[in-house]
Every structure is written in structure tokens, then in C-alpha cells.
């Protein structure tokens, strides 16, 4: 692996997005709380506070970041479903990762992630095809269709889980 930042590669997807792709991505989002929990199973405090790469976040920060990011995504979906192409508020994820709550036990975020994903997945499975075409506008990256955002956040969960599993493999944990 050449770039530890992208252990599964950067987000890409085939066009056109099919219903099968959407179903797979929603399943990956649904599976994330269990996959992330498995990835950190039996890690001690020192391991949780180990960066996944030089200059990168610690395992603990990665876990908390996933919840921060997915909470924002859930809100973005709800905005896109109830408003016409809303402009969403970006956040400084690197600064959020330095806030005091990023030092909390990872179980706090794992419980949040499980509950959040139950609600989010319920919402995602309720979407009609026309809902997948709805968009939100990110001031830095532009307009994003919900269909693409589902894939992006499925990838995002696998991406950060792989940060942890690849670290464990490299260090024989």
C-alpha cells in the first residue's frame, strides 16, 4: 500500500448508478457500526491513541470522526429531502478531531454510531428513485446528488475502518 491515507483508494463509482449499487451501499452503511466495532476489538488505550500513520489521527480520533462526519451527512440528507438544493455548512474536521470530546472512550461514539445508522438506514431504505436525484450544495465541492452521497458515505465508513485494520495488520495487533 503506497498511500496510508487511502488504504482502499479514493472514492470512485461507475456510471450510471444502479439500484443494485444503491442497495449495496446502504448495506455497507448499515454494516458499519459492527465493522468498526470489530476493527477496534480488544485494542488497549495505548493502541487506541496510536496514529494510523505518521501525522494522522489516532484510532480513537478516527472512531469519533466517523460519527461526526456521519451525523453531518444524516442532516445533509434530511435537508436535501425537505429543501431544494440546500447549501450545507462545511465543518473543519481536523479541528473537530482536536476538541476535548475526541478523547472520550470510543464506546461513546460507537453507541451513537449504532443509533444514528439505524435512523439513517431507515431513511435511506425509504427513498424513492426520484429522491436519489435530489441534491445539496457544498460551498467547496458543489452540487451532490443523494445517490452519489450514499456511495460516498459507504466508502467513507470502509475507508476509515481500513485505516484501523491496516494499522493492526502492519503492527501485528
Curated annotation (Swiss-Prot):
It comes from the Bacteria. Keywords: Cytoplasm, Hydrolase, Metal-binding, Zinc. Its EC number is 3.-.-.-. Its main location: cytoplasm. InterPro entries: DinB-like, DinB/YfiT-like, Put_metal_dep_hydrolase_YfiT. Coiled coil: none annotated. Possible metal-dependent hydrolase. NCBIfam families: PRK13291.1. This is Putative metal-dependent hydrolase BCE_2729. It comes from Bacillus cereus (strain ATCC 10987 / NRS 248).
